[in-house]
Curated annotation (Swiss-Prot):
This is 3-hydroxyacyl-[acyl-carrier-protein] dehydratase FabZ. It holds the Pfam family FabA. It catalyses: a (3R)-hydroxyacyl-[ACP] = a (2E)-enoyl-[ACP] + H2O. Involved in unsaturated fatty acids biosynthesis. Catalyzes the dehydration of short chain beta-hydroxyacyl-ACPs and long chain saturated and unsaturated beta-hydroxyacyl-ACPs. Its main location: cytoplasm.
Length: 141
């Protein structure tokens, strides 16, 4: 099942320039794969870096967090709720992400306790790992 930008906008509160998920390619109960098409028109490229544009690593992690957020907030029991980013661990950046790249982002929920969830996430470009880490979320109203 795919999820288009309209359904993503319905699930997430983020809007331009902070909406970093363009389309969901696959979704199951605890795993999601989505894409972000990275273009030179992204506002962060104006300062990071003007002569050598590179997507900031923290925004790659934010895109992964939003990907996981789409999975959680698309569930009927979480409609109208928010997902709060509570932390990230074991983050590694392996490849620069530049204009023209397509980030393929995967998030898999590995642990849940009450309103807290832990996700293993990774972002790839052309099948090569760009970033990975463990993300922690709190689900609230």
């Amino acid at each position: 099942m795919t999820i288009d930008i309209n359904a993503i906008r319905e699930a997430l509160p983020h809007r331009y320039p902070m909406l970093l998920v363009d389309r969901v390619l696959e979704v199951s109960e605890d795993e999601i794969t989505a894409i972000k098409n990275v273009t030179i028109n992204e506002p962060f490229f104006n300062g990071h870096f003007p002569q050598y544009p590179v997507m900031p690593g923290v925004l790659i992690m934010e895109a992964l967090a939003q990907t996981a957020g789409v999975l959680e907030l698309s569930k009927p029991e979480n409609k109208g709720k928010l997902v709060f980013y509570a932390g990230m661990d074991k983050v590694k950046f392996k490849k620069q992400v530049v204009p023209g790249d397509q980030l393929v982002m995967t998030a898999k929920f590995v642990k849940r306790r009450g309103t807290i969830a832990v996700v293993e996430a990774k972002a790839e470009v052309d099948g090569k790992l760009a970033a990975s880490g463990t993300l922690t979320f709190a689900i609230g109203s």
